Swiss-Prot record:
It comes from Protobothrops flavoviridis. Disulfide bonds join C311-C391, C351-C375, C353-C358, C407-C436, C418-C431, C420-C426, C430-C453, C444-C450, C449-C475, C462-C482, C469-C500, C493-C505, C512-C562, C527-C573, C540-C550, C557-C599, C593-C605. This is Zinc metalloproteinase-disintegrin-like HV1. GO terms for biological process: apoptotic process; proteolysis. Keywords: Apoptosis, Blood coagulation cascade activating toxin, Calcium, Cell adhesion impairing toxin, Disulfide bond, Fibrinogenolytic toxin, Fibrinolytic toxin, Glycoprotein, Hemostasis impairing toxin, Hydrolase, Metal-binding, Metalloprotease, Protease, Prothrombin activator, Secreted, Signal, Toxin, Zinc, Zymogen. It is an enzyme of class 3 (hydrolase). Ca(2+) 2 binds at D470, M471, D473, D484, R485. Its EC number is 3.4.24.-. GO terms for molecular function: metal ion binding; metalloendopeptidase activity; peptidase activator activity; toxin activity. Ca(2+) 1 binds at V406, N409, F411, E413, E416, D419. Belongs to the venom metalloproteinase (M12B) family. P-III subfamily. P-IIIc sub-subfamily. One of its GO terms (cellular component) is extracellular region.
Length: 612
């Protein structure tokens, strides 16, 4: 059995309180000096790691003893993590450095179950923790031949710019509070409930622009550490809504910027999102990317992101200004913008969390917390129910993982039976969190065919059919997995008004109802002739952002035209068009376009047997 190493470090408080000192976090007016003394007790035969899996720090703050428990953030990096920078002559240099034994930790104060600490132990101890509602920062003093560290309150750091920073999202066109409440509390379909219950992962890519490279002294290691410190906190914040953020790669524009980074945030966001879609996604598959920039945005803006953009090639992006020396404030801004990508709007005055300010507050203050408000949680849930973004459901298979397995990162890898997180957070009675092996007598730890650590009997229904294109799924009695079965693509459905396509029955009528409401229906054929125009209200596909007009036989595979029979809406040729998502309102692939014909993913009406 693998034993988790516990390291105890006593921090002796130096009998001195400083009045003012310049530290990495800025000019600090009041601080305490502490000296870490490390005491290690390795189990017999244990392998010494450079950075232990678990550590405990004991020290004194304002004369009161504090015990800080830390555990390595094992889910911080993805298994195929990569780093890219550029040589002086502009050559792209990409490496896959080992990241299993890293130095980034999450933690908590003893007798407080809430995770309130984020610490890096790479070069001394640097990070922050919360104690009795106050945010404290610890960092090395960098004195010659000394282990001295400073501990101080965030409020004692002199602020370079007292003007509060804000998010640039100002007009969301989001649903009303009532509709969100109805969506999140309404009866869910089996497919929606299955989606909500599934674990979710964001494979995250972070880019630093050239100004960041210059700002951190042209030192790749220093900038890399800044990026890691920031994402470590973002990961911790998003875990509160059951989103695991795995850093899949970083890129540093060390030679020059790959876009024109401007002080106008919406222009920079659009340029970055376009570069991500056209360049980065083709090079590195990921779910979401942000640009960390050293430029000062116009006004008080600290960041900007597309609302509800997650999983969309053009819109799963955000930009964040490196606006403060204290990285946890930059991390909160980044988590805020990712919150927008995940469907959350700004908090209103009526929104609450167990803190003075919640993550999605429109203004970033020194009271910023890691907590999402009741409104944010409701909006996020409603967004997931309505859109069910698929990319965040994907986690790697054992055979996909090429790096050594890391027990505790929530990914079941080669050599592991289960992975329920760290020993402190695991609540799975079937899984031994220390070894990632099943406990004695257990056959399984998770899966729809697993019940109280045992396989369900053969023939047990594990998933009901959701519609006529689905099939009831049965347990085999030999596995915890519930194999997903469904009707073959092309099977007629809904009284021959459609054909099954990837377990759904897409029809134009149902798509109109989803877009315009229960009184909507598909328009007459004449409306679809607009798809021969090749402009925003009528096209079949795009090539390099150019809209391609439909051929006559393909007009029903372009923009969807609907008629709304409501008294106030009598336009017979209604469409949905959004400049932020031009493909919204297009006829979905697999939709019936004629007898025996269905739309393919290229906007063509082809024989139903060739569509798939």
């Amino acid at each position: 059995m693998i034993q988790v190493l516990l390291v105890t470090i006593c921090l002796a408080v130096f009998p001195y309180q400083g009045s003012s000192i310049i530290l990495e976090s800025g000019n600090v007016n009041d601080y305490e000096v502490v000296y870490p003394r490390k005491v290690t007790a390795l189990p017999k035969g244990a392998v010494q790691q450079k950075y232990e899996d678990a550590m405990q720090y004991e020290f004194t703050v304002n004369g009161e003893p504090v015990v800080l428990h830390l555990e390595k953030n094992k889910g911080l990096f993805s298994e195929d993590y990569s780093e890219t920078h550029y040589s002086p002559d502009g050559r792209e240099i990409t490496t896959n450095p080992p990241v299993e034994d890293h130095c980034y930790y999450h933690g908590r104060i003893q007798n407080d179950a809430d995770l309130t600490a984020s610490i890096s132990a790479c070069d001394g101890l640097k990070g922050h923790f919360k104690l009795q509602g106050e945010t404290y920062i610890i960092e090395p003093l960098k004195l010659p031949d000394s282990e001295a560290h400073a501990v101080f309150k965030y409020e004692n750091v002199e602020k370079e710019d007292e003007a509060p920073k804000m998010c640039g999202v100002t007009q969301s066109n989001w649903e009303s509070d009532e509709s969100i409440k109805e969506d999140s509390q309404s009866n869910l379909t089996p497919a929606q409930q299955k989606y909500l219950n599934a674990k979710k992962y964001v494979k995250f890519f972070l880019v630093a622009d050239h100004i960041m490279y210059l700002k951190y002294g042209r030192n790749l290691t220093t900038l890399r550490t800044r990026m890691f410190d920031t994402v470590n906190i973002v990961n911790q914040i998003l875990q509160r809504i059951n989103i695991h953020v795995a850093l899949i790669g970083i890129e540093i524009w060390s030679k020059e910027d790959k876009i024109i980074v401007q002080s106008v945030p919406d222009v920079t966001l659009k340029l970055f999102a376009t570069w991500r879609e056209s360049v980065l996604l083709k090079r590195k598959n990921h779910d979401n990317a942000h640009l960390l920039t050293g430029i000062n945005f116009n006004g008080p803006t600290a960041g900007l992101a597309y609302l509800g953009g997650i999983c969309k090639p053009m819109y799963s992006a955000g930009i964040v200004q490196d606006h403060n020396k204290i990285h946890h404030l930059v991390a909160i801004a980044m988590a805020h913008e990712m919150g927008h990508n995940l469907g959350m709007d700004h908090d209103k005055d009526t929104c609450t969390c167990r803190a003075k300010a919640c993550v999605m507050a429109g203004t970033l203050s020194c009271d910023a917390s890691y907590l999402f408000s009741d409104c944010s949680r409701q909006e996020h849930r409603a967004f997931l129910i309505k859109n069910m973004p698929q990319c965040i459901l994907k986690k790697p298979l054992k055979t996909d993982v090429v790096s050594p397995p890391v027990c505790g990162n929530y990914f079941v890898e080669v050599g592991e039976d289960c992975d329920c997180g760290s020993p402190a957070t695991c609540r799975d009675p079937c899984c031994d969190a220390a070894t990632c092996k099943l406990r004695q007598g257990a056959q399984c730890a998770e899966g729809l065919c697993c019940d109280q650590c045992r396989f369900k009997a053969a023939g047990t229904e594990c998933r009901a059919a959701t519609d006529e294109c689905d099939m009831a799924d049965l347990c085999t009695g030999r596995s915890a997995e519930c194999t997903d079965r469904f009707q073959r693509n092309g099977q007629p459905c809904q009284n021959n008004n459609g054909y099954c396509y990837n377990r759904t029955c897409p029809t134009m009528n149902n798509q109109c109802i989803a877009l315009f409401g229960p009184n909507a229906a598909v328009s007459q054929d004449a409306c679809f002739q607009f798809n021969r125009q090749g402009n925003y209200y009528g096209y079949c596909r795009k090539e390099q952002n150019t809209k391609i007009a439909c051929e006559p036989q393909n007009v029903k595979c372009g923009r969807l035209y609907c008629i709304d029979s409501s008294p106030a809406k009598k336009n017979p040729c209604n469409i949905i068009y959004s400049p932020n998502d031009e493909d919204k309102g297009m006829v979905l692939p697999g939709t019936k376009c004629a007898d025996g014909m269905a739309c393919n993913s290229n906007g063509q009406c082809v024989d139903v047997n060739r569509t798939y």
